[in-house]
Amino acid sequence: MEKVVGIGGMFFRAQDPDRLARWYHERLGIDPVPTDYGKTCWTQAAGPTVFSPFPDATEYFGDPARTWMINFRVRDLDAMVGQLRAAGEDVQLDAEAYPNGRFARLKDPEGNPIELWEPKDSPPPPATSD
């Protein structure tokens, strides 16, 4: 059986797509969609991707009107949470460390739920030279 090899895109409706794309770029480092096919789009690091339908009545996403939630892998959850909070974002850090890693939650400017995940065996952040 032929199988898909990964997720090629995440498409969703937005009230102000340009503003929302800027927010994702400025806050999370996701490059906007290129304006021509000769340029490269955002490329994610290799790693696990969880694909999981949830029961319709789940409370996991928060607001019941939201039918989806995206989970982004991060290398250093504490650094990402600090960066987002410094930019004025309300981020809820889950105090519990789970067998598969650590998590935090926030919403984008249009109220879409976002989960940040630092996998348990996440590689260390790259060294910086100051």
Question: What feature does the model see in each segment?
Answer:
Residues 1-5, 11-50:
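Core segments of cupin and vicinal oxygen chelate
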Residues 11-12, 23-24, 72, 103, ...:
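Aromatic side chains
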Residues 14-16, 74-77, 109, 120-121:
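Short loop segments at secondary-structure junctions
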Residues 29-66, 106-109, 113-120:
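Conserved short beta-strand elements that form part of the metal-binding/catalytic scaffold
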Residues 1-9, 81-130:
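Vicinal oxygen chelate
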Residues 9, 48-51, 67-69, 101:
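Structural motif
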Residues 63-84:
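Mid-chain, well-packed structural core segment of small domains
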Residues 29-33, 72-73, 93-96:
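Short linear motifs in intrinsically disordered
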